[in-house]
Amino acid sequence: MIIVTGGAGFIGSNIVKALNNIGYKDILVVDNLKDGTKFVNLVDLDIADYMDKEDFVASIVAGDDMGDIDAIFHEGACSSTTEWDGKYMMDNNYQYSKDILHFCLDRSIPFLYASSAATYGGRTDNFIEDRQYEQPLNVYGYSKFLFDQYVREILPQADSQICGFRYFNVYGPREGHKGSMASVAFHLNNQINAGERPKLFAGSENFKRDFIYVGDVADVNLWFWQNGVSGIFNCGTGRAESFQAVADAVVDYHQSGPVEYIEFPEKLKGRYQAYTQADLTKLRAAGYGKPFKTVAEGVKEYLAWLNRSV
């Protein structure tokens, strides 16, 4: 069996889909379906069982026998960069991750988990997996950073796989439940389908991010699991592309336009990553050689999926 925490969420459900694609269906999804809309991410997937997050935490802390487990993909977390409840964030992202990590270490179960590019904070260069380059801007980034630090202390002594991925700007199918935290491509598509002009912040040609298609993220996870590689790795494309490029791809797909530019919100100033670009040196050195989709390629594939039944 494989366990995917956050399996009804965005990246988790795409990992479940990727596992299904290689014939793997003995999957336990762990999630919190308080937000009942997330169930839609699972309806076309094959899983063996579902378990509520709180029941799962109680089981692993108690050391319950959960049978033979081939791997745990730990994607479950609070991923809102605008959430400032530090206790909630640390319980959800830090303590929960430690509990699962030790459960895996005690049983030699491969443990692959979601870190984040938010660990790098507001820097504009050297997005390198090293302590000197890490300075998170918000409590979400700090919770991810602190767990990475915890993992770094344990890695040299670990007898089983521990692998963390610093996800950059992930977009693609199954993110609709994220609301305001969903990708720009998702929101622009909705605006156009509602008969509105697509809206971007003024200066969006200058805001550049490393946008990575979620299918590529799932591929990275499966490759590292199948190859047993440990460490903390950036998971981006190695290319910074502008929000304008995302809008251009959406407008091109819909043959619509023009874009309407709106003022940048005051509350985000100083807390907003203006530039991200993954350094892929470590990822490539580990042996991962697949190419990553460009924004133009990924957005086109994503919009075809989003509009498949419109």
From Swiss-Prot:
User: What cofactors are annotated for this protein?
Assistant: NADP(+)
Highest taxon listed in the record's lineage = Bacteria
Enzyme Commission number? 5.1.3.20
What residues does NADP(+) bind to? Answer: 10-11, 31-32, 38, 53, 75-79, 92, 144, 170, 178
What EC class does the entry list?
Answer: isomerase
Question: Cofactor note from UniProt?
Answer: Binds 1 NADP(+) per subunit.
Residues binding substrate are 169, 180, 187, 201-204, 209, 272
Annotated catalytic residues = 140 (proton acceptor), 178 (proton acceptor)
Swiss-Prot/TrEMBL catalytic activity: ADP-D-glycero-beta-D-manno-heptose = ADP-L-glycero-beta-D-manno-heptose
* CDD domains hit by this protein: ADP_GME_SDR_e
Question: Which InterPro entries does this UniProt record tie to the protein?
Answer: Epimerase_deHydtase, Heptose_epim, NAD(P)-bd_dom_sf
Q: Which Gene3D superfamilies match?
A: NAD(P)-binding Rossmann-like Domain, UDP-galactose 4-epimerase, domain 1
Question: Hey, which pathway is this one from?
Answer: Nucleotide-sugar biosynthesis; ADP-L-glycero-beta-D-manno-heptose biosynthesis; ADP-L-glycero-beta-D-manno-heptose from D-glycero-beta-D-manno-heptose 7-phosphate: step 4/4; Bacterial outer membrane biogenesis; LPS core biosynthesis
Q: Which GO terms describe its molecular function?
A: ADP-glyceromanno-heptose 6-epimerase activity; NADP binding
Give the keywords, sorted: Carbohydrate metabolism, Isomerase, NADP
Show the NCBIfam families listed in the entry. Answer: heptose_epim, PRK11150.1
Q: Which family does it belong to?
A: Belongs to the NAD(P)-dependent epimerase/dehydratase family. HldD subfamily.
Written domain comment of the UniProt record: Contains a large N-terminal NADP-binding domain, and a smaller C-terminal substrate-binding domain.
Subunit annotation? Homopentamer.
**Per its database record, what is this protein's job?**
Catalyzes the interconversion between ADP-D-glycero-beta-D-manno-heptose and ADP-L-glycero-beta-D-manno-heptose via an epimerization at carbon 6 of the heptose.
The protein's name in its UniProt record: ADP-L-glycero-D-manno-heptose-6-epimerase
Name the gene for this chain: hldD
